[in-house]
Amino acid sequence: MKTEFYDFIKIDKNYKYKNGDFSAANGECLTAEERIEFLKAYSDFLEKKNGYEMPEKAVSDEETERLAAALKYKIAHKIRKRIRVDEMAAETYEKPENFSSWQFYHGVSEKNGELTFSDGVIPPVPCAKYEFECEKLTSFAFSFVLPEEYIDEEKKNGKVIPLTTDTGRIIELRRGVTEMLKLQIYRNGEIHARVGIPDPYHHRNFKLGDFKVDERNTVLIDLYEDFYEVKFNGTPAGRFEFTNKAMPDTLFISGGMHPVCKWSFKPESLTADGKTTTDFFKVAEPKEEGKQNLGRVELPFKIGGAKNKDKIIELSEKFVYDGGRAVLNIGSLDPCGKVYINEKFAFETDGFLKGEKDITKFLKTGENELKLLVYPRAPEINYSWHRNKDPYIAWLARDVYIDILPEGYIRDLVVKTVGISGNKVKAEISFKTVNFKKGLKTKIYLAKSPCGEEEVIFEGDAAESFETETEFGANLWTCENPALYTVRVELIENGNPVDDEICETGFRIIEQKNGDILLNGKKILLNGALWMQFLPPYENIVLSHICPTTKEIVWQAAMTKALNGNVARFHMLGYGNNDPRFAEVCDRLGLMNIWTTRLIDSAETIDVKNGWRAGKIYAEQMQEVINHPSIIMWEGSNEFHSSRAVLDKMYDEFVKTVKAADDTRLICPCSHLYYGGGLYGNKGFYYQDDGKFNQDFEPCESSFGWKDENVVRSSHNYEILLGYGNRWDIFREQAWKSQPALFKSKDHAYIISEFAIVGRQDNRTKEAEIYHKDDSYELADEKRAFGEAYEKLDFKLSQAYQALCAYNTVKYMRYLGADGLMWCSLSGGANDGSYIKPPIDFYGYKKQAFYALKEGFAETICFDKKAEVAYNGKYVCEPVLTGAEKGKTYNVKMEIKNQSGEVVCERGFAVKATAFTFDLEPFAVDLKNGYYSVEYLVEA
């Protein structure tokens, strides 16, 4: 093993300040001009070191193709007959509606000119759309009724101000997909105008008033050339800018991201071109379906985008049936759909949930036809802060197969690793026997995947609910050697196997002990990036965000590995993910992941009164992917501002639900709730690590969920890691008082599950010539960081600063004791391609920060523990070795080179590790004015 790491410093004998900060509030740092000069020198150094002349892909197209082909194998049953439906004939056609100009999505009904939206327990949330034509819209009036059940009493009583990320009922006027104006009804009892000026991704909220529950509330919007005015319940509520100036032609009514309760909406009047419409629901005239034949398509299959708006996907396939119980399995029809067998309606899916139905009664001997209808997704916007302009996110059909089953058969096979000793594994294997009867036997086989020779690891009596612990020899699953095995369970009747069930899995134990994360008993750091999954080309983002191709999944995994990452935190905004392909790819490539299920952010819906309504379904989603070794952690919510009562309930409900389904993995109920207590200006509630004090260190005892032994601590501490353009002195001081206990905790590991600094994209690529978007809202971070010097930045200096920050934040957090570091995010593409935090651009090209993170994420590295860049002649290096194995000997070489690459100081020695992170002997050296690289080489 050999690793390299680099510090970069400036020597100036006239530098007179105590700390060598790049920037600081008191001015004791590099001047604005010196910062630009520093970055020019640093950019030159990085280009030479990294061989950067033109942008280079993090993973080549050829390598992605090779990996995808190598991972494509399937494991198969030996007894059970499975009819796989990998391809289907596809057609699309416009979804018919009862009323002209309307589209109802997922549970909307009309009566007496009023729409009722019937929320369920999980998404999709009912929505409706009305399209109209006019030259000039001058006013629109509507009314709504929300029950008391909609109110979040804590938010209302606490007068909690809505955030950009808060969900709620939305009434929006658009021009096609372009937003003109938006009103949002929040659960704190208020209705607001949301204005996307100057930043369309972060709307400003303007309160219109408090709405009445269980009564009709009225809204009148008068539209003028440059602004609109709102009257709420008859009272003028304000004048506001349009987010975009154009003439609306679409009314969109959204229920928000999370279901809450039934509510109603009534369009009262619409005045356009001098005419007023009050009758909105005219019966639509029948029209021919006008099907478009797409030919044969592979599953999963999806369509999306405004060009396909409101189209139903119809998929059909013929298959031969020759008897037996036939059970149809559908991974997902998302957002919802229907199933027909031989032109007869069979069943409707429960939203996007897995469908499993006995279809025997619909079948005939010989040829049969399966037909699936997938209904279009509403043009909803569940993540405005990272949205793309086109809101028609794809609708899709996932994997489909038909099992032919005997009277008694196996289901719900689960394999858990419960103990390891060298190459000996103890596994708990369980399954259910449907229609169990006495005398049934079982035999369990193990084979190396994909096609190793089977060995019997258990045989004995079966049971209705079977569970056994068995010990056997096997290689452990690790990121470096992702050993996988096929476990096959046979059900035997009268000496003959009648059914079998299979799963591919790996054997490993993930746990936290003494505040560390251990994989197979070895301390590891969880280093990697978020997958937000806005993938190129631009017009395909609507498709890949929710349903990428398997090759695109492989591409993301390969890029994460190229970054020296060992973990992906799945963060597919608005929709999450429960597609087993992600886990399968990560299993086979050796990449751990943090899993959200399709119910991303669902833990936010947990409240004191109702608990977690979707908890049972979250647990069901867990069971679909339970055997994948790459999944090491379950996540419930992203960022959340909480009260004490809600926090206790959230953690208790999430921990209880998750552990009932799986007690072998780590748990993260919320990845960041540290608002207040010295981090960020927002007031929020949280406990100190020990659960005995609150954010202000006042005595306060937590409930059991906060203290659970599987729960990790997690933060998004951008503010003190140079994020948002913050200063170097804030970073160096790390003044958040709650954090030292997180670093030192012996009960819980502490991961920084989001951090990042911006770096502009290099547009000198063939892809960027076709499409790129430079006007990023994140450039405000650079303006804040550089002030008057901002205008002197170009993409090279921007990338140099991002790399400088990446080197220093990673090394400093590793030195202080972080157990994980995850950059936000892996690659660009969010915000219409203008999101510039990722170290890999939208098209997969490396920025300079890629190299910094790759080196910083290496297992064992050496660096100067000071996060400073300027010195006044004498440089004192305080080297640290981290990622070491106690008792192991490491050869360390340090070289200080000037700008010409000449070595001006060299040190080399062998050192025996005394801890995971430990100090080496400091040394001082007098240097001439100039810029120097401090290079560290570690060999073991």
Residue ranges and their predicted role:
Residues 215-229, 332-334:
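Localized edge beta-strand/strand-to-loop motifs within extracellular or lumenal beta-rich domains
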Residues 240-264:
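Flexible glycan-contacting loops in extracellular carbohydrate-active proteins
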Residues 159-195:
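Glycan-recognition/cleft segments
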Residues 117-134, 200-207:
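Secreted extracellular polysaccharide-interacting domains
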Residues 124-149, 157-159, 315-317:
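A carbohydrate-recognition surface predominantly in extracellular/luminal proteins
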Residues 195-218:
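Short, aromatic/His-centered strand-loop micro-motif at the edge of beta-sheets
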